[in-house]
């Protein structure tokens, strides 16, 4: 393979640089390099099943990777935040995040309701959320109160949410999966 970039894709909940580079468990995490400039444009991360396609690989875009590196450099945990909300695509608008359900009924943490449309972080309105991965990326490194720009019943409003790290599964005594508790 030559590592030819064939496009940017949204797949599995995040943006990827699509390439024909052969990616496997031995080289995942390696750089995807622009041969014209010598710059790293992505971090090779995943491959599509060889049965489905031949040589279809995906790399994390450097914009996302650089943000994680910057957070690490500053001693900030870059882990994805805990988001107690599920999303769906807004009606006939593939470029908006519409709230489908709120898992924790704690309005002081996430005062969102089903059918709210989450637009952007306050102060970053020029970077609107298109997919859930945009929200996750924007909230990386945040710990505490954050303001979201939300549209509810046609009215744009600001809501303060509590951003917190995702709970570590290893800290749990038991895990509930499909009606069974493993402890």
Task: Annotate each language-model stretch with its function.
Residues 9-13, 91-92:
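Short, conserved beta-turn/loop elements at beta-strand boundaries and strand-helix junctions
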């Amino acid at each position: 393979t030559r590592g030819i970039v064939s496009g940017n894709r949204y797949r599995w909940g995040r943006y990827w640089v699509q390439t024909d580079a052969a990616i496997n468990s031995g080289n995942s995490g390696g750089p995807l390099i622009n041969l014209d400039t010598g710059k790293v444009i992505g971090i090779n991360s995943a491959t599509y099943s060889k049965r489905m396609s031949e040589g279809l690989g995906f790399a994390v875009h450097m914009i996302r990777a650089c943000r994680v590196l910057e957070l690490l450099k500053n001693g900030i945990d870059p882990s994805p935040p805990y988001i107690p909300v599920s999303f769906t695509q807004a009606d006939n608008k593939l470029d908006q995040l519409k709230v489908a359900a709120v898992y924790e009924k704690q309005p002081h943490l996430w005062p969102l309701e089903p059918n709210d449309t989450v637009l952007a972080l306050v102060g970053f309105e020029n970077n609107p959320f298109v997919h859930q991965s945009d929200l996750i990326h924007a909230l990386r490194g945040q710990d505490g109160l954050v303001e979201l720009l939300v549209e509810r019943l046609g009215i744009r409003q600001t809501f303060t949410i509590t951003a917190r790290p995702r709970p570590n599964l290893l800290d749990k005594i038991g895990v509930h999966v499909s009606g069974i508790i493993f402890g």
